[in-house]
């Protein structure tokens, strides 16, 4: 210092010391300010601190700040996440009093019955969403966007589809392109003999349910109109110069036979095979890893089978799906799944969804629901044929919607009874107060959706077998429930077509509207003369719908049926998926009927999905 003083005059030395002191004071104040407003990282994004609070925080004593920082970051790491966030700074004059708002736990007494824990922020009280969700029947979840959490709340869980206006009998059926009937857990499998779903909804034994079969057909019909054409890989046509097919790679073990032969009935060559059941069978390498809809033309001369080997996601294990010439529904043993496809002693086409067949087999159970499974096929490895018979046109494709549609249409033609209906061969108990429906009952919803399916099959093929079947299907509409029909009369005035023809009548809304859509499809397709009866039934039904629609409006949602009126019990409120079905149906009807009531109800019922309610007095 003496050396420095000797070399620098006192005025310069004083300036240097003053600058040094000023820098020290500024740095000291900055450190104090930073610590005073320090908050846990996971809470800092939620704090809103205004300029006055920041200023108060900067003036907090350093000892107190150090104590708080040390306590929050070191002493209680678990509590740090649970503690309510503190909003605002500290007031030095108030003995450490927190400025602004803070969360604090508060008891919440619910309806004078029980207490739950909530949180209070000033005058605002927050209840746990786990309680809110159940109490108000609402929905919410935490989702991530760009690394940040966000809570999304919704009043309902079901969506309304945009109506393709106007509706036509040869077009997409409502929003059925989004239906996947075969993957439902109440579908036991797709029958190998019939090619349609077998339901277990009301009985684990399985039964054919006309509504489900019609929906299966209508969904695939609609998908065919809305999806791009499928990719098809041809593996065998038995033609030597077929440029579209893959190179033939058949393996014929000793004792087996395979050859291309002419089939005069088909005017083409086919593959003849002879392979004893005890042999490995003749096999064709496939190796497809993209598509899983297999199709082949088949004719057996003896008992036999066609099997498909699949490499799966289950540790790359091989599973084999066997299509056997018997009537067994489905069986599963170890890694082998069996579907009976019937004798097949005349030429027929077998089309199977290997994904569905694999998963239904692995998930097979003795209960009403198929067991959930994650297994999926990764590769279609090879096809194996045993017995004596013929094969042709072996393909694998992305989809085969029209095959599924015509399987449903053909089933409806084959299984319609002499009264024009499709009897449902399972007992149905709708609820307390209603008599059980014994096996053999008809459903107006089944009749309507079957008609919609058959009309489309007729419009595609111009085959009158489909139109005639649809025309006969109007007969149950004319008979009362107690006469083994589907008609009910509300207040001795309004004709109604019952989804469930119960005693007393139930007046289910969605099933009634489906029955009307079927009648509309038929009257528009059959013409003035043939469609006369369908037109009369449709017009009477539409009059009833317009008169009775207000009975299904609760002011905040819709009602499934009128059991509260018929039985004098609590109303049967429609779940949100049924509520949106009501809206989708009314949207469709609004494109074929100009009555303003349909658009008015659509608008109001849509608003209920967002929490709107009718005005009170």
From Swiss-Prot:
GO MF term (any one): racemase and epimerase activity, acting on carbohydrates and derivatives
GO BP annotation list: heparan sulfate proteoglycan biosynthetic process; heparin proteoglycan biosynthetic process
Residues noted as binding Ca(2+) in the record, renumbered to the chain: 237, 239, 268-269, 392
Protein EC: 5.1.3.17
Transmembrane residue ranges: 12-28
Cell compartment(s), UniProt: Golgi apparatus membrane
Intervals, Lumenal compartment: 29-617
Membrane topology label: Single-pass type II membrane protein
Chief place where the protein resides: Golgi
Binding locations of substrate: 179, 184-186, 201, 209, 212, 215, 429-432, 499-500, 510, 514, 560, 563, 572-581
A Pfam cross-reference name: Glce_b_sandwich
Catalytic reactions of this protein: [heparosan-N-sulfate](n) = [heparan-N-sulfate](n)
Pathway: Glycan metabolism; heparan sulfate biosynthesis; Glycan metabolism; heparin biosynthesis
Site, as annotated: Critical for catalysis: 179, 186, 560, 578
InterPro entries in alphabetical order: C5-epim_C (IPR010598), C5-epimerase (IPR039721)
Cytoplasmic side: 1-11
Entry GO CC: Golgi apparatus; Golgi membrane
Alphabetized UniProt keyword annotations: Calcium, Golgi apparatus, Isomerase, Membrane, Metal-binding, Signal-anchor, Transmembrane, Transmembrane helix
Family according to the record: Belongs to the D-glucuronyl C5-epimerase family.
Physiological role: Converts D-glucuronic acid residues adjacent to N-sulfate sugar residues to L-iduronic acid residues, both in maturing heparan sulfate (HS) and heparin chains. This is important for further modifications that determine the specificity of interactions between these glycosaminoglycans and proteins.
Subunit structure: Homodimer. Interacts with HS2ST1.
Name of this chain's protein: D-glucuronyl C5-epimerase
Organism: Bos taurus (Bovine)
């Amino acid at each position: 210092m003496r050396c420095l003083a000797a070399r620098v005059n006192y005025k310069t030395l004083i300036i240097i010391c003053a600058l040094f002191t000023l820098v020290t004071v500024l740095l000291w104040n900055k450190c104090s300010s930073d610590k005073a407003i320090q908050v846990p990282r996971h809470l800092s994004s939620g704090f809103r601190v205004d300029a006055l609070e920041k200023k108060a925080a900067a003036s907090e004593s350093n000892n107190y700040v150090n104590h708080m920082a040390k306590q929050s970051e070191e002493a209680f790491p678990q509590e740090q996440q649970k503690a309510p966030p503190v909003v605002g700074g500290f007031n030095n004059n108030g003995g450490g009093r927190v400025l602004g708002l803070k969360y604090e736990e508060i008891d919440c007494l619910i309806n004078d019955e029980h207490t739950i824990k909530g949180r209070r922020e000033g005058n605002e009280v927050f209840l746990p969403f786990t309680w809110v969700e159940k109490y108000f029947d609402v929905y919410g979840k935490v989702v991530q966007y760009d690394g940040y959490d966000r809570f999304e709340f919704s009043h309902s869980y079901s969506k309304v589809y945009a109506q393709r206006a106007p509706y036509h009998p040869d077009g997409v059926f409502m929003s059925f392109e989004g239906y996947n009937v075969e993957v439902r857990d109440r579908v036991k499998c797709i029958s190998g003999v019939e090619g349609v779903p077998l339901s277990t909804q009301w009985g684990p034994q399985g039964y054919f349910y006309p509504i489900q079969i019609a929906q299966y057909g209508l969904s695939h019909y609609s998908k065919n109109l809305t999806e791009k054409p499928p990719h098809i890989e041809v593996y065998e046509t038995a033609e030597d110069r077929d440029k579209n097919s893959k190179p033939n790679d058949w393996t014929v073990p000793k004792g087996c036979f395979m050859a291309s032969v002419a089939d005069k009935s088909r005017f083409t060559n086919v593959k003849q095979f002879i392979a004893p059941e005890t042999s490995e069978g003749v096999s064709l390498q496939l190796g497809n890893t993209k598509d899983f809809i297999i199709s082949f033309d088949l004719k057996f001369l003896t008992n036999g089978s066609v099997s498909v080997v699949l490499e799966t996601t289950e540790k790359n294990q091989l599973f084999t799906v066997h299509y056997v010439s018997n009537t067994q529904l489905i069986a599963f043993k170890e890694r082998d799944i069996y579907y009976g496809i019937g004798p097949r002693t005349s030429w027929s086409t077998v089309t199977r969804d290997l994904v569905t067949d694999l998963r239904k087999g692995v998930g097979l159970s003795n209960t009403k629901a198929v067991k959930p499974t994650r297994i999926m096929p990764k590769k279609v490895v090879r096809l194996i044929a045993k017995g004596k018979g013929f094969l042709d046109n072996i393909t694998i494709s992305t989809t085969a919607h029209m095959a599924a549609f015509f399987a449903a249409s053909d089933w409806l033609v084959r299984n319609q009874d002499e009264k024009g209906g499709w009897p449902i061969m399972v007992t149905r108990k709708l609820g307390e107060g209603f008599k059980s429906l014994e096996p053999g009952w008809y459903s107006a919803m089944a009749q309507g959706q079957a008609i919609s399916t058959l009309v489309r099959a007729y419009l595609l093929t111009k085959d009158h077998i489909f139109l005639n079947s649809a025309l006969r299907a109007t007969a149950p509409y004319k008979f009362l429930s107690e006469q083994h029909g589907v008609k009910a009369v509300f207040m001795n005035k309004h004709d109604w077509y019952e989804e469930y023809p119960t005693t007393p009548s139930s007046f289910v809304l969605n099933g009634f509207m489906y029955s009307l859509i079927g009648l509309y499809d038929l009257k528009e397709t059959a013409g003035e003369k043939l469609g006369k009866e369908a037109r009369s039934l449709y017009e009477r039904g539409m009059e009833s719908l317009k008169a009775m629609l207000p009975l299904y409006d609760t002011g905040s949602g819709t009602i499934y049926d009128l059991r509260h009126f018929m039985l004098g019990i609590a109303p049967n409120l429609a779940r949100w998926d049924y509520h949106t079905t009501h809206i989708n149906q009314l949207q469709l009807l609004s494109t074929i009927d100009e009555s303003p009531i349909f658009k008015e109800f659509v608008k109001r019922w849509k608003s209920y999905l967002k929490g709107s309610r009718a005005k009170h007095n």
